[in-house]
Amino acid sequence: MEKPTQLTKSIGFFYVAKDNEAKTSELSLLLSQKKAILIRAQWPSVPFLSVMDNVSLANKKGGDLEDVLPYVQLPLSALKKDRTELTPFEELKIQLLLALLSERETLLIENVLSTLTTKEVQTLLPLCQEIAEQFAVAIYLIHEDECFAHTPYTTYL
């Protein structure tokens, strides 16, 4: 029997301190139950496939790619780039795209902010808030810097 969790019913963009063992443990449980998807600084793509092929491979539910791309602010041309040409921010957006196409209700973003510029972080936070509202998902930003807990875009847990 699966252990119930309050986090599975949440919708919004939440900050979780990396050292909050209770919440991170609960989120790890969601990952192990395949109820959540993890977004990392390094996109774990299949190395010998193109970016577009990686996206197509991960899009098992057959969601309409072009409908979701505007929500992650990613042009179709980014999917035609070589994997080595992608910026860390583009990799992050591709992972957000894949998470939305997978139709999971919970997305975990862990330790990615240090790979982004200040401007990219300023773009990412409202973007995640908007995605959470538009797709009725819970997005958890797991990070050690609590300054992200006090933005107008996140709810601190």
Task: Give residue spans per PLM region.
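ABC family nucleotide-binding domain
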Residues: D19-K23, G62, T84-E85
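GG-anchored amphipathic helix commonly corresponding to the ABC/SMC/Rad50 NBD signature/C-loop
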Residues: F89-L108
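A short helix-turn-beta junction within AAA+ P-loop NTPase domains corresponding to the substrate/partner-engaging
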Residues: T151-L157
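Conserved catalytic loops of ABC-family nucleotide-binding domains
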Residues: E103-E105, T117-A149
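Conserved ABC ATPase signature
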Residues: D82-E90
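Q-loop/switch helix immediately C-terminal to the Walker
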Residues: A41-L74, D82, Q95
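Walker B catalytic motif
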Residues: D82, L108-T117
